[in-house]
């Protein structure tokens, strides 16, 4: 269909067609005409596109390439479809950067925050849009004000885990000045911090504990015991109470070859996802565990990077994996 034919279609039909396109294709359509750009960048289309993307969440892989030209490599793939982790013919994407290393934060509504010291970049892996900034205060996108606002937290602390977003709040594990583990909550609307009491003193974010999304709830989980296969968790319920849960995973020691794996959380199927904490010569492996069937599946990430340097410690000095990433039209 050429541009002239597309322009003659009713706007509702144009939106329906555009909803089926990838973010990369949508970027090209913003250059076709002002009308297309107006539709794609409109608030209604943003909401429709995001709602559709939520039905097919992805795993997002972010790797810092350390050989040759310094760059970030992104790859997204459907997380709940067979064959396991179907890439749907999407190719890895590389972004060249001058910094030696960027650390990515948990994606929120299709956007990720890349940090390197005081430098911050807001990036959309789909259309490859980004917005760099060297300030680290509060910034509200789309508010019309486009300004940073400084705020204070009465509890001095240092973030030590990834950030989770739930119902307008940001949750993250932290360490106090006295090296005590804390669970912090930041309300995006009120821009206020609060401290959530942890279930007990054994929860230490510097000693094998992590913050995860467990079936839509905030939870703290310890690394799986290599010998017993026990995954110990505390889950925060809707009443603000911590509930203890222990999941024993069969054949864990044989499957992991005595390696330590991080529990990353759950996906829509209810499966638990794990990734190795360290890797040297072998490619990182993702494990999926189904509590109902007791089935533990393996997937090697090497298969996704065939056209890039080998996925090992000498080629990439940091690999991060995020669950439930969705496509969005922000930053187009």
UniProtKB/Swiss-Prot annotation:
What residue range is the signal peptide?
none
Which Pfam families does this one have? F-box, FBA_3
Show the InterPro entries listed in the entry. F-box-assoc_dom_typ3, F-box-assoc_interact_dom, F-box-like_dom_sf, F-box_dom
Write down the SUPFAM superfamilies for this protein, in alphabetical order: F-box domain (SSF81383)
Task: Give every F-box domain span.
Answer: 3-52
Please state what the protein is called. Answer: Putative F-box protein At1g70390
